[in-house]
Amino acid sequence: MKKMVSVQRLLAALLAVLLLCPMAACKKQADIDQWEAEEKERVYSSLTSGQYYDLDGRYFYLHDTGLYERPIVICFWKMDRPESLNALPAFQKAFERYGGKVQFLMICTYSENDGSGSEDAKQWIEEKGYTFPVFYDRDQILLQRLRVEKLPYILFFGKSNELVHIRNEALSEGEIDTLIADILE
């Protein structure tokens, strides 16, 4: 009799887990959606007024002519953050697949106080064989303005300059493909 009760409890617990797992996944997606909606409002004005630097030290703004001819993916990353570095191979593959349709801005943020700078990042990128375009946020001015707390920090802009998605975690190739499909619509 005790075994029967134990088996019934085990089955009840298993059934509860099976029923709650999809609900938890939905809640996670709902949490992401809510966070993203709040983040979009906060980020948009700060981001479009920011100043960016290319490999040669020339600066530009996101509203510069021609930048919005295609959808844009902006990924903020940092040399001393392993999660940032681990995210870059998936973005390299996405750049290879979508580089003709989507503008990629891979922004390495650094501070000279960190002990690394643009030359360190440039050398590392060359060693890894990355071909996506890299830009720099000197002294983390944009990160501070955006109040970014976790890297990588990724923004997906659609064709009409609309901020469609924001993520603050490393993404798989499949996740990047899905988010890029949204901005290509």
Locate the predicted segments by residue.
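Thiol-/selenol-based redox modules, centered on thioredoxin-like
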Residues: 156-185
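Short active-site neighborhood of thiol/selenol oxidoreductases, capturing the structured segment around
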Residues: 61-85
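C-terminal motif of bacterial Sec signal peptides marking the signal peptidase cleavage site
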Residues: 21-25
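N-terminal "domain-start" segment that seeds a small globular fold
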Residues: 30-64
